[in-house]
Amino acid sequence: MSLTLRVTTPLAAVLEEEGLASIRAEDASGGFGLLPGHVDLLTVIEAGVLRFRRPEGPWHFCAIRGGVLRATGGRLVTVACREAVPGEDLARLEAGLKRQAEAADQAARRARGEQVRLHANAIRSLMRHLDRAPGADLSGIVEAFE
């Protein structure tokens, strides 16, 4: 008997491996392993690296950003998570994840900068329109944004 591992995200089925001898993951209680014939299990897993291997084979890896692991029937293990990145080499997987995190940080900084720019433009536009309104008192508005 062997295990089948399926890892899915909302956008794609990232991984499906059959004939596995063991799977290792981590939840709030710590690390745990699954072997063929394991009792049914449902747990929330932490962000980290899921490890799996075939009999007599090397470990393979899949970095996940938290999720839900479900083992059913002693054979099928499914992981539903927000993001997953499979990899054969742990060092290369870590380097790739670091690059992805840096790119996400840069994109978030650009988005924050754009949000500030749009907010400032909206305030300027509002001030121009209010300034044109007859009898408008802008003193409270101006003080609120200084």
Curated annotation (Swiss-Prot):
Disulfide bonds: none annotated. GO terms for molecular function: ATP binding; proton-transporting ATP synthase activity, rotational mechanism. The keyword Repeat does not apply. InterPro entries: Alt_ATP_synth_F1_esu, ATP_synth_F1_dsu/esu, ATP_synth_F1_dsu/esu_N, ATPsynth_dsu/esu_N. It is a peripheral membrane protein. Keywords: ATP synthesis, Cell inner membrane, Cell membrane, CF(1), Hydrogen ion transport, Ion transport, Membrane, Plasmid, Transport. The keyword Glycosyltransferase does not apply. GO terms for cellular component: plasma membrane; proton-transporting ATP synthase complex. It is found in: Cell inner membrane. Its main location: membrane. F-type ATPases have 2 components, CF(1) - the catalytic core - and CF(0) - the membrane proton channel. CF(1) has five subunits: alpha(3), beta(3), gamma(1), delta(1), epsilon(1). CF(0) has three main subunits: a, b and c. Produces ATP from ADP in the presence of a proton gradient across the membrane. Belongs to the ATPase epsilon chain family. This is ATP synthase epsilon chain 2. It comes from Cereibacter sphaeroides (strain ATCC 17023 / DSM 158 / JCM 6121 / CCUG 31486 / LMG 2827 / NBRC 12203 / NCIMB 8253 / ATH 2.4.1.) (Rhodobacter sphaeroides).
